[in-house]
């Protein structure tokens, strides 16, 4: 081949090092950004599903009634984002015979969660971390918890359990801080729903394995337990 042509072709070809070398820091930064974006999208989706599910139940309740009585305006609690939407839905719902809306206690020291006693309790009794049913019927139960994990050197399992009479009926489980992740802080939302027929004196409680990770500072109003009587024999 002509030496001049060979030299021109060599000048057009990109250097092998330039084409293949990508700084390790750039890759780690890109992965960290992708992980955070995925987490925020997942949290927003869960919150939207929570509101949508409760709203759907409310529509079904409204369709079963002839009129909706005026709701009280003196409810002392005010939530933020998802919990605020949930509380607003409950305040405007036609059922008033039996319902409750409680926020998690500020200081937790055991796996069975305790709740603020100054929440809304109507036709339901609260005792030692339990909601105690006073009227039999079909109840809708919802619990939402926000976790903040300072990642240790190992993965962490976050679990939320809904218990009826001390027996686990529903649970949600997620593993965070897995090996290879670049982030040091993880925000994780867990929620669970249950529709079940409950008798008088039935107890409802919530357990978590890692109560120390429940975020009562950044999102104190996002940790709620709520129930309402959807249908009874009356």
From Swiss-Prot:
Give all residue intervals belonging to the THD domain: 98-225
State the source organism's domain of life: Eukaryota
Keywords from the named record? Cytokine, Disulfide bond, Glycoprotein, Membrane, Signal-anchor, Transmembrane, Transmembrane helix
Which molecular function terms from Gene Ontology are attached? cytokine activity; signaling receptor binding; tumor necrosis factor receptor binding
| Assembly mode | Homotrimer.
InterPro entries per the UniProt record, alphabetical: TNF_CD30_ligand_type, TNF_CS, TNF_dom, TNF_ligand_SF_member_8, Tumour_necrosis_fac-like_dom
- State the species of origin: Homo sapiens (Human)
Topology in membrane = Single-pass type II membrane protein
Which parts of the sequence lie on the Extracellular side of the lipid bilayer?
A: 63-234
Q: What does this protein do?
A: Cytokine that binds to TNFRSF8/CD30. Induces proliferation of T-cells.
Give the subcellular location.
Answer: Membrane
- Which Pfam families does this entry report, sorted A to Z? TNF
**S-S bonds:** 151-177
The Gene Ontology CC terms held by the record are:
extracellular space; plasma membrane
Q: Which residues cross the membrane?
A: 38-62
> What protein does this entry describe?
Tumor necrosis factor ligand superfamily member 8
The record's similarity note reads:
Belongs to the tumor necrosis factor family.
Cytoplasmic face residues: 1-37
Q: Which CDD domains match?
A: TNF
